[in-house]
A protein has these predicted regions:
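Alpha-helical transmembrane-bundle signature of multi-pass membrane transport and export proteins
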Residues: 2-435
Length: 435
């Protein structure tokens, strides 16, 4: 008995989507990462609500994000160089341990009634410094868990775990902040780091993929920027990614203001974050199922993010806002996963840490610019515009980037029209013109 093409495709898709999980080390790591990031999103949600309660201003929430992500902007690429030169597993063990200490200190100070806004800002800076080194090491370590042909899938699953945890984390924070208070949510987050520390210690290091470490010396920022500027495709992707990352992903500010001032519900903030998390998980898994990621997938999901963001900003009811938040998360996660995959596809092993760090700078490190701007717009122009302006800028950036890529992939007509036209064909991508 033979299987139909439909049956074959239906059984192949799930295995393609989760093919990285056939490795025990990858299963251990992703399970621990899921538990840990659920706790992280609990803390982020509780922190935004706490700062807003203390000040009543979205601008203060934006300043908190500035403190958290400014170290990423200043240290991100250098931290990526450290990840390229040293054992990424050891770096992740150290940074994850320090993140647990930061969360425990935050919770303890709150429970002792010693936590003030200046202390929140200082601990946010501490969090940012640790995260600047954790991000490239942890994300770069994912590549060591799987075979080279599975790197794109593993990175997409990593994005799915990181963004999918937003479904559970904010929902738990919204439900438990009232009865438990923010302090115990911070303590719970500290405890969740054991879920990622144990796999890092318990995994079989003999099954890790060999990596080429970068040599010491050089100028990591200049090297990474030089590599990108030499590749027009990567350059366009990074510029669009930077614009969108700066202005479109400031959800702790814009969704908080939208939930409280537009719909009068603090708990709706957690529900909106959870809805974007649901969409994010779907978008990441869809991207993970694709054998190769093109720039057209990147631009298409950027457009989805912009359009659905506008719909969310001016949603007429709370439930309409929740429904609109799902495609916002889907487009946003697929957009981020596509950028990560394109960088990995186009970069050598000894440059990946720096390029991942540069991508993190473009996406997270620009938050010190976008978050205060978003908070100021929320306080002075309204919650709708704090989300709407970023969506509009996203559509403009995507349209310009798409136009540049479209022009660069069009076949060139020779000066002698009697000569046949030539095109560069990418057979690995289904035989189409190289995007």
């Amino acid at each position: 008995m033979t299987s139909s093409p439909e049956q074959l495709s239906s059984t192949k898709a799930p295995s393609m989507m989760f093919r990285s999980l056939r490795h025990r080390n990858a299963r251990l790591f992703f399970f621990g990462l899921l538990v840990s990031t659920v706790g992280t999103w609990m803390q982020m949600t509780a922190m935004s609500l706490l700062v807003y309660e203390l000040t009543g201003r979205a601008t203060s929430v934006g300043v908190t994000l500035l403190c958290q992500f400014l170290p990423m902007l200043l240290l991100g690429v250098w931290a990526g160089a450290v990840a390229d030169r040293h054992d990424k597993r050891r770096i992740a063990l150290l940074t994850q341990s320090l993140l647990a200490v930061q969360a425990a200190l935050l919770g303890t100070l709150y429970l002792l009634d010693l936590l003030t806004l200046p202390i929140v800002y200082v601990l946010s800076v501490v969090l940012g410094v640790i995260t600047a080194f954790d991000n490239p090491a942890r994300r770069g370590f994912v590549i060591e868990l799987v075979e080279p042909s599975e790197i794109t899938n593993a990175l997409s699953l990593n994005t799915a775990v990181m963004t999918g945890s937003r479904i559970v984390g904010p929902a738990i924070a919204a439900g438990l902040k009232g009865p438990l208070g923010a302090g115990w949510l911070f303590i719970i987050n500290a405890a969740t780091f054991t879920a990622i520390l144990w796999p890092l210690l318990a995994m079989d290091r003999t099954r890790l993929q060999p990596v080429t470490r970068a040599v010491r010396g050089g100028t990591p920022v200049r090297d990474a920027l030089r590599f990108i500027t030499r590749d027009r495709r990567l350059l366009v992707v990074f510029v669009v990614f930077t614009v969108v990352g700066t202005f479109a992903f400031n959800y702790p500010v814009s969704l908080l203001k939208l939930a409280i001032t537009r719909f009068g519900s603090e708990s709706l903030f957690g529900i909106l974050l959870a809805a974007t998390g649901l969409g994010s998980m779907v978008g990441s898994l869809i991207t993970a199922a694709r054998p190769r990621i093109t720039t057209w997938w990147f631009f298409g999901n950027g457009a989805l993010l912009g359009v659905s963001g506008l719909a969310l900003a001016w949603a007429p009811t709370a439930w309409a806002a929740v429904l609109c938040a799902i495609p916002v998360g889907l487009g946003g996660a697929a957009f981020v996963a596509a950028q990560n995959a394109i960088v990995q596809q186009e970069s050598p092993a000894d440059m990946r840490g720096r390029l991942l760090a540069l991508g993190a700078v473009a996406f997270l490190g620009t938050t010190p610019i976008g978050a205060p701007v978003t908070g100021w717009i929320a306080d002075n122009a309204g919650a709708e515009w704090s989300l709407g302006y970023g969506s509009m800028l996203t559509l403009v950036a995507v349209a310009i980037g798409f136009a540049i890529r479209w022009r660069s992939t069009r076949p060139q007509v020779p000066a002698d029209h009697h000569q046949p036209r030539t095109m560069v064909v990418d057979y690995a991508d289904g035989g189409g013109v190289v995007p």
